Amino acid sequence: MIVVDTNVVAYLFLRGEFAARAEAWLRDDRDWAAPLLWRSELRNLLAGYLRRKQLTFEVVREIQREAEALLIGNEHEVDSLRVLELIRDSDCSAYDCEFVSVGCG
C-alpha cells in the first residue's frame, strides 16, 4: 500500500510534467490509499481549473469520478487525536498529518 498525496492522484488525470512519474508509481503498486480529505482537496484543485476555464464541467466531473473509482475501498477516516499528535511532533500541516496518519496505520 502506498499513501498518495492528492497531487499525485491529480497528476494521473491532469497531463503535466509529473504525469509519467505518477503512472509509473501506479504500475508499481496499484494499492493506493488516502484519507477521505483527498476528495475535497481534488475538488478544490479542479475548481481552479474550472473557474479559469481550463477544463469544462464535464471533464472535471469525469476526472473526479475516475479518481474516486481509483481509490475506492482505500479511503480512510483518520483519528483526530492521532493527527493532533502528529501536528504537535512535526512542522507538517494538519492536512499532511492526515496522510501521515493513514500511512502509520
Where do the protein language model's features map onto the residues?
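Conserved acidic
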Residues: 34, 59, 91, 95
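Short, well-structured N-terminal submotif of metal-dependent ribonuclease cores
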Residues: 1-37, 49-58
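Active-site-proximal, substrate-binding regions of enzyme catalytic domains
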Residues: 43-72, 80-83
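Short glycine-enriched loop/turn motifs at secondary-structure junctions
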Residues: 25-27, 68, 104
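Hydrophobic side chains within alpha-helical segments
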Residues: 8-10, 44-47, 99-101
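Active-site neighborhoods of divalent-metal-dependent phosphate/nucleic-acid chemistry enzymes
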Residues: 72-105
